[in-house]
């Protein structure tokens, strides 16, 4: 049984930045430090930060007045930002810069009075934050959410000739392309972003899984069940005709999965650390793996700057 590692896999620049923001804030200011929502969608990462002193909450009313709060990588609505300011909270923003780009795009279309369509998954925190950039006090029009082609067919917009779209950053590239095609067919004058809003890491990891699926008869995706990009990786492998499972850690591997399997692919979502992948490889060796090799893959060199207040050199 041979194991093939996807490349790239695991942490992206936005996740690296978000985790480092929490760690540095704790180091510089001490505890307690509050984090609104899981800073990234990975149980191992969140548990590690809890042990360091981070307190995770879902809403700002759980944060004491005047305390320090970090916004997660998924971003927050304008209403949350206003509430934080009104309550005198000290805020560090771990929103991924690629999500911020989408937020700015939505705000720009709001100011021009266009209607806006967001392609995304209802209930996901990134979608809630992006929908919340639409400020009725600063513009007219409306923002609509579509999740699939059927939603596009059923959609009724107030301004079909004054319309734009954007997307959640962690979607299936293939699904999103099909939805955009449906939007353009129904609304020929719709405006889109200059560049694809699917993030580079999402695109690269999906391309890598597609390569794995061509060579493997099983693909294991390391990632938490609430991770959008991790779920998309497992779904993509299945669409390519390969059995695939999303696992939080090596402990979730069922030995029955690898029976009669000759080539097992392993990848990790953008919020899953390498230490979890290492644990999966160790478990696969216990189950009979004889070798591990790695695809050459697409190099990633993206680095996002920390907030200015956290760039100061820490002094022991």
Curated annotation (Swiss-Prot):
Its EC number is 1.17.7.4. InterPro entries: LytB/IspH. (2E)-4-hydroxy-3-methylbut-2-enyl diphosphate binds at residues 41, 74, 124, 169, 227-229, 271. GO terms for molecular function: 4 iron, 4 sulfur cluster binding; 4-hydroxy-3-methylbut-2-enyl diphosphate reductase activity; metal ion binding. Its cofactor is [4Fe-4S] cluster. It is an enzyme of class 1 (oxidoreductase). Binds 1 [4Fe-4S] cluster per subunit. Signal peptide: none annotated. Keywords: 4Fe-4S, Iron, Iron-sulfur, Isoprene biosynthesis, Metal-binding, Oxidoreductase. Isopentenyl diphosphate binds at residues 41, 74, 124, 227-229, 271. [4Fe-4S] cluster binds at residues 12, 96, 199. Transmembrane segments: none annotated. Coiled coil: none annotated. The active site is at 126 (proton donor). Dimethylallyl diphosphate binds at residues 41, 74, 124, 227-229, 271. It comes from the Bacteria. It catalyses: isopentenyl diphosphate + 2 oxidized [2Fe-2S]-[ferredoxin] + H2O = (2E)-4-hydroxy-3-methylbut-2-enyl diphosphate + 2 reduced [2Fe-2S]-[ferredoxin] + 2 H(+); dimethylallyl diphosphate + 2 oxidized [2Fe-2S]-[ferredoxin] + H2O = (2E)-4-hydroxy-3-methylbut-2-enyl diphosphate + 2 reduced [2Fe-2S]-[ferredoxin] + 2 H(+). Pathway: Isoprenoid biosynthesis; dimethylallyl diphosphate biosynthesis; dimethylallyl diphosphate from (2E)-4-hydroxy-3-methylbutenyl diphosphate: step 1/1; Isoprenoid biosynthesis; isopentenyl diphosphate biosynthesis via DXP pathway; isopentenyl diphosphate from 1-deoxy-D-xylulose 5-phosphate: step 6/6. GO terms for biological process: dimethylallyl diphosphate biosynthetic process; isopentenyl diphosphate biosynthetic process, methylerythritol 4-phosphate pathway; terpenoid biosynthetic process. Catalyzes the conversion of 1-hydroxy-2-methyl-2-(E)-butenyl 4-diphosphate (HMBPP) into a mixture of isopentenyl diphosphate (IPP) and dimethylallyl diphosphate (DMAPP). Acts in the terminal step of the DOXP/MEP pathway for isoprenoid precursor biosynthesis. Belongs to the IspH family. PANTHER family: 4-HYDROXY-3-METHYLBUT-2-ENYL DIPHOSPHATE REDUCTASE. This is 4-hydroxy-3-methylbut-2-enyl diphosphate reductase. It comes from Xylella fastidiosa (strain M12). The gene is ispH.
